[in-house]
Amino acid sequence: RTAQLLCIYIRTMAPNVKIILGGPGLSHNGLHGVNMGAEWQELKLCDHWVKSEGEHPIIDIMEGDYISTPEWTQIKNLDEFPIPVYDSYDWSLYRGGIPITGSRGCVRKCTFCDIHTHWKKFVWRSGKSIADEMIAQSTKHGVYDFAFTDSLINGSMKAYKEMCNVLRDYNSTAENPLTWRGQFIFRPRNQMPEDIWKLSKEAGLAQTYIGIESLDEGVRDHMRKKFSNDDVIYGVKAMNKYGIEGTFLMIVGYVTDTEETIKNQKEMFEVLSPYAGTSITKVAVGSTLAILPGTPLASMAEDLGITLGTNENDWVGLSNQTTRLQWRQDLIEHCVKLGYNVPEHVGHDQMMTSGSVINV
């Protein structure tokens, strides 16, 4: 709705300005909902729309040789493009630093997520190219904080370590060391040993947004998250040791959730409570589980005995929406009593954009 109002305002105040809409989320109700671009072009609220990646289409648009289409081919080599030019930006008007993209897609295939129906392959830039862009932009604009737009900043550990090594070396002598934040996954100790956590801090990692989703291992296994509660404890302790802030992103009312799994989550929050306000800076409890079109859960619904409703949150399986909303409220109240900072209602995208200019 906000985007629509902005387009109407631009059309009214500056009718000669060209409006281009784009991105993987150019739709209502998930990646596979109604095509918002085609709808708004028909309403004359935009001149062009680009489904997903815009590096090649923007050139075609400038040359007058582009037809908006839902068909597109994913770019495999993200290192082939020059870094963004922000010369027209007044960075004093923005909070949270400069957005940067190091990868597209995701290494996980979570059951509730539709990203793999869009980004078929996880692709990433070299770690050096990411670090070089951050150094160049900070030198040019005098902005020293960066917000990653990636689904995961540590999806490729090879690229992640390479980036951290370059940034650590730069920060060790820089007058204004760089800091950065982004969405993150907890990995087992053998995949991310303590020396990598130390390196991350020295490289400028300030804040992580971690898709925990559930602190019940059985629920999380069904989600295909691929990390254990021991991995969570290890990661939280490492962040605490090196002064890295973390926001837990939670989903309440998964398809396998029961009173017992909610109880297990409460107990795990009790175990982690010594880190409330330190390495666990916030616990973001979003809406109850939404089953979006194009997700594995949507295709598994019949086998799981789920009846889909008129919207993505209104489904019936082991639980109904009334029960899930009560679980959510109970979990929030429990976390608050334990000393966690729990925003009243914050979704994943809002957590990432609070204090930044990025969208995920």
Name what the model sees in each region.
Residues 25, 151-155, 185, 252-256, ...:
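Short, solvent-exposed turn/loop segments enriched in Gly/Ser/Thr/Pro and often Arg
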Residues 11-16, 168-177, 242, 274-279:
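Short helix-capping segments at alpha-helix termini
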Residues 245, 260-360:
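C-terminal accessory regions of radical SAM enzymes
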Residues 82-246, 252-254, 267:
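Radical SAM [4Fe-4S] cluster-binding motif and immediate context
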Residues 33, 37-40, 196, 256-271:
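Catalytic cores of alpha/beta
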Residues 1-142:
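Acidic, low-complexity intrinsically disordered segments
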Residues 20-21, 50, 181, 247, ...:
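Structural detector of well-ordered beta-strand residues that form the stable sheet scaffold
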